[in-house]
Amino acid sequence: MKKITYGLILTALVSLPAQAEWVLNGDQSALSFVSTKAINVAEVHKFAELSGGVGADGMVRISIDLASVDTSIELRDERMREMLFNTAEYSTAEISAQVDAAELADLSAGQSVDMMVEGVLTLHGETRPLMMSVVVARSGDSNLLVMSKKPVVVNAPEFKLAEGVEALRAVAGLPSIGLAVPVSFVLAFDQG
């Protein structure tokens, strides 16, 4: 009887990691975007604070702290927080998606798989569908990396950000700021 009980406990413990959640490791993750001004001047920026995870059911939820925008110029960061993102009212952008949890669990350390992930992005009070071409790699027994295979293009007018972009353009005295913004990411998850 003891052998059966120990066997059941051992089976439950071995099964646990496959059912456990994946927690986003913000220190090992990066989300960057490219802005284009004056027609052909491109600059790379990032958000420093990301959080979220993947549930045992495959539900992905990522939160981007918009106040953590980092353009390497503090005045520009402040203007983006106030004039573009309006972080007093909209403090985060949220991404949610559903992935095949079994496919993630089946990956062995060192293996990777390409996925098309359909999700939604909520930004500035607007929610829009989002298609993401990603590579998912099992980097260790309890670590996953999810990387954009192609940039995701976010169009400012779809999220009612065009007026904010125009305000930034005017205050900076620029001839133009692009409304289509390529976004790339590397998300590191630790199994919890």
Predicted regions mapped to residue ranges:
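Positively charged n-region of N-terminal signal peptides that target proteins for export
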Residues: M1-I4
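Bacterial N-terminal signal peptides
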Residues: G7-S15
